[in-house]
Each structure stands twice: as structure tokens, then as C-alpha cells.
Amino acid sequence: MSPCGRALHTSRGAMAMLARKFPRTRLPVGASALCVVVLCWLYIFPVYRLPNEKEIVQGVLAQRTAWRTNQTSASLFRRQMEDCCDPAHLFAMTKMNSPMGKSLWYDGELLYSFTIDNSTYSLFPQATPFQLPLKKCAVVGNGGILKMSGCGRQIDEANFVMRCNLPPLSSEYTRDVGSKTQLVTANPSIIRQRFENLLWSRKKFVDNMKIYNHSYIYMPAFSMKTGTEPSLRVYYTLKDVGANQTVLFANPNFLRNIGKFWKSRGIHAKRLSTGLFLVSAALGLCEEVSIYGFWPFSVNMQGDPISHHYYDNVLPFSGYHAMPEEFLQLWYLHKIGALRMQLDPCEEPSPQPTS
């Protein structure tokens, strides 16, 4: 036998001896399932250290420079949005992308789907009702950093203004957040909490909607099964009274793809915030994007305490969104010139001297 053959024979014998001495055991079914759960959890919520609030604020202050738009960065990111999520065609449910008989899965639930029938199909516009590309867009979050910002006039100068979650726009706020609205989101949870699901009285809701003038009300009717009925009630309520607003239903495939896109870039949360969904859509629909009120921290740039929202200090449920992670992604897009993030107070014209 050659030396190589003897070595191979010896190796096999050693392996057989080890196998007899340490026989393989199978993991119990429960242990195997637990391993799968742990691996999935680490994939969804990986263990890593995110900078704390103070470190993020200090980092922003250290990295601030005069902002300049970068058309190359903006075009590249718009192309990425088009490739992954196609907002021009999938932003809202339409007769073109959601034909009768099509089955779609709720993007926020794993076990439920729905089939588009004649009653729902008739609620959709023929196609996305925007003249694309939109020129100059402002996406307005609700962060407390907007209070005393004087940004209302700048916001209203945009061609297309998007707002989140039916925010108050009464006269006490317009100097800071403006009054113009082309699109505003409305989560079904807001319809439940503020307007009792429109089961008892619709007048309060209709009166509240008047502040948004001729805007689109963008609702994720098919994200969670519990949100479908409240969303449909909003549609029929506004239609019955001949309101100026038009309801658009978010396409669950669009929302799902946006979630995957940001997850691949390091945002790990149960669900993205409404604000990030809107900014993502704007980056795919608009030539220029400026964002306001996207500051999820308890102090402003000068270190002074601020409220969570510009209109109240109600904190969100912890662990549902990953707001600091979202901010860091948006801050990066600001730094490369793909969008403009307004963090300082806006300059207001000096009052004219009286004669």
C-alpha cells in the first residue's frame, strides 16, 4: 500500500473511532425550532450598537456644511426607487395595477389576502393621478423641531406638499408648518382613535378634513385587515358629503417593497414610519425633495428640550419604529445632496418699518 493509501486508511479509522466514542445526537424538535426562531430574530433585529441621541446630535453638528443639491445623487436614488418599487405606477392602487379578480396580500400581515371585486375596483382611479415628475416637493413630518421654526412660508413655496397623519394646520401653526397640502396620510388607527371609526358621527371628521382643501387622503387600507373597513368608511364619508378631498389607497406591494429596500440598507424595525414611506415615494416621484420636521430627538440642535410633535408631546409606542436609524439614513441622503433636510429655523423676511 502506498504512503497516501496508508494515510487515508488511518484517517478513516480514526474518524470511525471518534464516531463510536462520540455518537451524533439529534436536537429535539423544540430545540431546532428555537434555533430557527433565534436566527430569524437576529436577522430581523440584529445585535449592534446604535449611537445614542447625544452622539447623533453631536455628529450632525460636526458634519454640517452648506448644503448643495447633487443631481447625480438624486437621479441615482430615483433610479433605485424605480427599480425596486416603481412609485410612478405602484404608489396607489389603480385600475391599471389592481385589476378585478387580482389577489393581493396585506403587507403588514402574513396570513391574510384579499381579492379585488367590483365594489373595491370601482374605488380606484384609472392610473396614478399625478403629472409626473413632480417638480419641487416638500415632505413635512410632525417633529417638535418645527415649533418656532418659521418654516411655513418656505414649505408653501413647494409645488407639492405631503404631510403625515392628519396633522393640525390651524392658524396657530401655519407660521411654522404652512397651510398648503396636496397629499396627507391617514392611518386607520387615527380614524379609530379620533373619530370612533366613523360609526356614530361623521360631522367631526368632515369638518376636520376641510383644512386640507383639495388634497389626496392617502390610506393604507390593505396593510392590516383591521384597517380595511375604517379606510372604506373614510372613502364613502367624503364621497357622500361631496368633500373636496380624494381618497387614494396605498398599494400593499409598494409598501412591502419599500420596507424591503430600507431593510437591505440597515433599518430593522417592525414597520417603517409613515414619514419614511412618504420620503421614499417623493424621491421616486419628484425632481427636488426637501423634508421638514424629521428630527426624532428630545433636544434641538442647540441642545434645548423640544416636544415630540410640534402640536403635542405624546410619545409613540417604543420598539415599533426605528426612528434614529431612519434619521441616519435620511441624514446621509442630505449629505450627498439627494434631498435637503431642514433642521435650522427658516429665515423669515424682516418686518417692514412703519412710517
Curated annotation (Swiss-Prot):
Enzyme Commission number, as recorded: 2.4.3.8
One GO CC term on file: Golgi membrane
UniProt cross-references to InterPro entries, sorted A to Z: Glyco_trans_29, Glycosyltr_29_Sialyltrsf, GT29-like_sf, Sialyl_trans
Presence of the UniProt keyword Calcium in the record: no
Signal peptide coordinates: none
MF annotations from Gene Ontology: alpha-N-acetylneuraminate alpha-2,8-sialyltransferase activity
Summary of the function given for this chain in its UniProt record: Catalyzes the addition of sialic acid in alpha 2,8-linkage to the sialic acid moiety of the ganglioside GM3 to form ganglioside GD3; gangliosides are a subfamily of complex glycosphingolipds that contain one or more residues of sialic acid. Can catalyze the addition of a second alpha-2,8- sialic acid to GD3 to form GT3. Can use GM1b, GD1a and GT1b as acceptor substrates to synthesize GD1c, GT1a and GQ1b respectively.
Name of the molecule in the record: Alpha-N-acetylneuraminide alpha-2,8-sialyltransferase
Species name: Mus musculus
